From Swiss-Prot:
Pathway: Amino-acid biosynthesis; L-methionine biosynthesis via de novo pathway; L-methionine from L-homocysteine (MetE route): step 1/1. Zn(2+) binds at residues 643, 645, 667, 728. Binds 1 zinc ion per subunit. It comes from the Bacteria. This is 5-methyltetrahydropteroyltriglutamate--homocysteine methyltransferase. 5-methyltetrahydropteroyltri-L-glutamate binds at residues 16-19, 112, 517-518, 563, 607. Its EC number is 2.1.1.14. Belongs to the vitamin-B12 independent methionine synthase family.
């Protein structure tokens, strides 16, 4: 009989119950006991949903109040010593301080979990880091599930992945792999505690096996699993997010009891494990996207495996279902307005039922679930033939693109002359990244408009009032190139998705980004085009209020792609180019309307990098082409800006230069301009605006701090190509600190301009 198991479930609840309880607790509106009760209820519901799918093992240990890697830092005693906390007796209050900071210590750094949109808290490892076991978190969840009469499988991220996703800190140089001999006995203690609590199987996840691991890290797997296998539980080694076929010989030799492989991201993997003689768990339902599976097709893959493996075949989702929204059945608006699209989707609860059907088909024959298989096939056929998805005009436009369709008319050296001729900017021109504070009044007006409580005319008047205020304040500050402040935008991707064809939105399709923060990604279900202008009216209104240049503001094609649930029936590169052409229509309309400085934001370019470096070039080529397509056809005198906010550029600088934006603004203040050194060494050819203060904090920088950063920038970038701007958009700031921060930036700029003029 084939076994069905789960690796992880969304933590936040169907209606973000955990988020609201956490935030109430932080505001001291509920007690710790009340928060714990909400969490316990959510865990029980999650397990019951898994049990309702006929799961042989429910997942435990995956639920967390903030992040599973933070839980692991606590469980191994690896919390940062700078907090002065005792990991053995950590209070919930202290746990949250690790994640959110306190008056004495900044929060643990966050970054994206592999190539997902989930953020984990990065372990801080020092040469002298000591580890200490505390298995309470995992044991408690195991016992709770057992008390409900369920068979449970604890899931723990493995020691090598734990070390891999951490960072080396401190003055002493060392390799974090050298901590393994100290860490391994602690893992043995944690696993032993789980065995004593009744765990039969334990899943140890090692997604690091899907990235380019150095040889010594790969070799370390032998010793690690030789040690861990001495614990008397059965070990299922979990891999996901990519192929581990290159490590097949190693994985077959490891003394574990089973292996989980991701057949959604890497469907070719069964060939590499055809002779595997232990449990082989195959992830056949997509844990990262929202499309219903064609179950007949899945069975065509899995039935031959069952014939070969018999009882050694296990099935599951490709990875934890953490990355998918909770329940499609509550999406009543989507069902009413787009019934076909609704029938093509599967959220977490629907995916559990897909796995139930697959298990029944494998164990009792396809006839036992003939009705469900027929419904799955009907949905797949409907999607394949839908005119809502496949549009001949969009396909023709892409097919007819000439070879150099993504190129500007002239090289940068010619364009910059044409731009300066009319812009006539001073040395060190100043600008903002885009957004200004989204006040309560703005949010209330938008909410009222969406509910039909505010007319379109009144909403437009309210937004125009905000735009006028933003323009007036920038003029008072004497900024050179202005922005309209984006008052009308709820979110930099959702705003455009609502105005482009091929996009749809959910009411409750929330997924956890980090901690209590959830995002509701748009769904790109069909060919993308732009029915009408999206930003022209707002930008031209803003331009009418000032003689200074006004920036048009667009979100770039790669970022829209990265922050959405993307259709899986055509290549992502094709979807991205469709978005780029839709944006190009907007760029040319802005230009026609007199907006001659246009920013196309691409904060997510780096996030899209494949896990394996061998795949980088292909991605960077189509990502760069998409960006260039979005601005192609502009006059030389139109200045194209882009903005990027992340800290690792060095390895992709040639690709960023190839995007050929006239001006790039980047987030650099928190790294003390270190990032800029890479641009200097690379001799980045176009204009550049490094952020001179950190907008993520309400703190107003001193003039000395901003001057220090700007002087560092002048050392690296030719002053005639240097812009001055904040790190990022100002959406999350209050007005008071925004104006004070910008005033400091302007004072320093004026001082250095005077100095440079001498």
């Amino acid at each position: 009989m084939t076994t069905l198991h789960f690796s992880g479930f969304p933590r936040v609840g169907a209606f973000r119950e955990l988020k609201f309880a956490q935030e109430k607790y932080w505001r001291k509106e509920i007690s710790e006991q009340e928060l714990l009760a909400v969490a316990k209820d959510l865990r029980e519901k999650n397990w019951k949903h898994q049990a309702a799918a006929n799961a042989d093992y429910v997942a435990v240990g995956d639920f967390t109040f903030y992040d599973h890697i933070l839980d692991l830092q606590v469980a191994t005693g690896a919390i940062p010593a700078r907090f002065g906390f005792d990991s053995q007796n950590l209070s919930l209050e202290q746990f949250f301080q690790l994640a959110r900071g306190n008056k004495d210590q900044f929060a643990i750094e966050m970054t994206k979990w592999f190539d997902t949109n989930y953020h984990y808290l990065v372990p801080e490892f020092h040469a002298d880091t000591e580890f200490k076991a505390n298995a309470k978190h995992y044991v408690q969840q195991l016992q709770e599930a057992q008390a409900l009469g369920l068979k449970a499988k604890p899931t723990v991220v493995g020691p090598l992945t734990f070390l891999w996703v951490g960072k080396e800190k401190g003055a002493v140089e060392f390799d974090r792999l050298s901590l393994l001999p100290k860490l391994l006995p602690v893992y043995v203690e944690i696993l032993t505690a789980l065995v004593e609590a009744g765990a039969e199987w334990i899943q140890i996840d090692e997604p690091a096996l899907t990235v380019d691991l150095p040889k010594e890290w790969v070799e370390a797997y032998k010793d690690v699993y030789a040690t861990l296998s001495k614990v008397s539980a059965k070990i299922l080694l979990g891999t996901y997010f990519g192929s581990v076929a290159e490590h097949a010989a190693l994985l077959k030799a490891l003394p574990v009891d089973g292996l989980h492989i991701d057949l959604v991201r890497a469907p070719e993997q069964p060939d590499a494990f055809a002779d595997y003689d232990k449990v082989l768990s195959v992830g056949v339902i997509d844990g990262r996207n929202i499309w219903r599976a064609n179950l007949n097709k899945v069975l065509e893959t899995v039935e031959p495996l069952q014939a070969k493996l018999g009882e050694r075949l296990w099935i599951s989702s490709s990875c934890s279902l953490l990355h998918t929204p909770f329940d499609l059945s509550v999406e009543e608006k989507l069902k009413a307005n787009k019934p076909d699209l609704y029938s093509w989707l599967a959220f977490t609860l629907q995916k559990t039922q897909e796995l139930r059907v697959l298990k029944a088909a494998l164990n009792e024959g396809r006839d036992s679930v003939a009705e469900e298989l027929a419904a799955s096939q009907a949905a797949a056929d409907s999607r394949a033939n839908s005119s809502e998805i496949h549009r001949a005009d969009v396909a023709k436009r892409l097919a007819d693109l000439p070879a150099n369709a993504d190129q500007r008319k002239s090289p940068f050296v010619n364009r910059i002359k044409a731009q300066q001729a009319w812009l006539n900017l001073p040395l060190l021109p100043t600008t903002n990244i885009g957004s200004f504070p989204q006040t309560t009044e703005i949010r209330q007006a938008r909410a009222a408009f969406k509910k039909g409580e505010l007319s379109a005319a009144d909403y437009e008047a309210a937004m125009k009032k905000e735009i006028a205020l933003v323009v007036e304040e920038q003029e008072k500050l004497d900024l050179d190139v202005l922005v309209h402040g984006e008052a009308e935008r709820n979110d930099m991707v959702e705003y455009f998705g609502e105005l482009l064809s091929g996009f749809a939105f959910t009411q409750y399709g929330w997924v956890q980004s980090y901690g209590s923060r959830c995002v509701k990604p748009p769904i790109i279900f069909g060919d993308v085009s732009r029915p009408e202008a999206m930003t022209v009216a707002w930008s031209t209104y803003a331009q009418s209020l000032t003689k200074r240049p006004m920036k048009g503001m667009l979100t770039g094609p790669v970022t829209i792609l990265q922050w959405s649930f993307v259709r899986n029936d055509i290549p992502r590169a094709t979807v991205c180019k469709q978005i780029a052409l839709a944006l190009n229509d907007e760029v040319l309309d802005l230009e026609k309307a007199g907006i001659k400085v246009i920013q196309i934001d691409e904060p997510a370019i780096r996030e899209g990098l494949p896990l394996k470096r061998a795949d980088w070039d292909a991605y960077l080529n189509w990502a760069g082409e998409s960006f260039r397509l979005s601005s192609a056809g502009c006059e030389d005198s139109t200045q194209i800006h882009t903005h990027m906010c992340y800290s690792e550029f060095n390895d992709i600088l040639p690709a960023i230069a190839a995007m050929d934006a006239d001006v790039i603004t980047i987030e650099t203040s928190r790294s003390d301009m270190e990032l800029l050194t890479a641009f200097g060494k690379f001799k980045y050819p176009n204009d550049i605006g490094p952020g001179v203060y950190d907008i993520h904090s309400p703190r107003v920088p001193t003039e000395a701090e901003v001057e220090h950063l700007l002087r560092k920038a002048i050392e690296v970038v030719p002053v005639e190509r240097l812009w001055v701007n904040p790190d990022c958009g100002l959406k999350t700031r209050g007005w008071k600190e925004t104006l004070e921060q910008l005033q400091v930036m302007m004072n320093v700029t004026r001082k250095l301009r005077a100095e440079l003029a001498k």
